[in-house]
């Protein structure tokens, strides 16, 4: 593999060097994602553990009152604090892994940009802006082409965006309406996040296929980035943006509403109604209160 500071002799050697540098990137990403998945599963287990202990603690307080200290209260409190600290440590571990993946991409991208700049300085590669300016005179307006892609006139929106499994039917109310609005917003992100690669021959784009790729590269990247920046809503226990498979809680008053599969230990869409751990705990408390009132 070439040295990091070595200047490429020509464009082909720069391409070969970049290909060699990123050869192991996929396997490195797989390893990082596997580590994050393990941390996610452990975190979910710890969270369920301290929620169960917290429920037991509340039950003891209700039975004996807050002034009378139960012998089990100390050990339960210690367990809750221990599991909560463990959850915090796991979240920190996941942040470090995510930053590692970001660093790997940034490092390779910076090196590719530096090689391109050095080739331009040596006169071995024509500056991209100059090449596009020369070809613009004999082609259609790029702005109109990009607008056509953005409006869906040159290609249809891809359906490979974020997948949001439909929640099973539940009682009508504010919770259901709120989840439906989130589903519609998710679908709009899917349509805006990716555009089709199939461009109609009659779309009025320049004849040179190389020019086509260069002309739309930066604008499409900015457009796609814009679609992702719109969805800054935080979901789930982990309070992160939406990604991958997500499931909606059927609890009408759920404060999170959407959950990542890995955070709730799911691998496939649940059958029937599904409630998050906190809503399940709330439902259990409601049933317990009803029984006490009947007694």
Swiss-Prot record:
Zn(2+) 2 binds at residues 249, 254, 276, 279. Keywords: Cell cycle, Chromatin regulator, DNA damage, DNA repair, Meiosis, Metal-binding, Nucleus, Zinc, Zinc-finger. A zinc finger (PHD-type) spans 233-282. Residues 151-208 are annotated as: Disordered. GO terms for biological process: chromatin organization; DNA repair; meiotic cell cycle; regulation of DNA-templated transcription. Zn(2+) 1 binds at residues 236, 238, 260, 263. Belongs to the ING family. This is Chromatin modification-related protein YNG2.
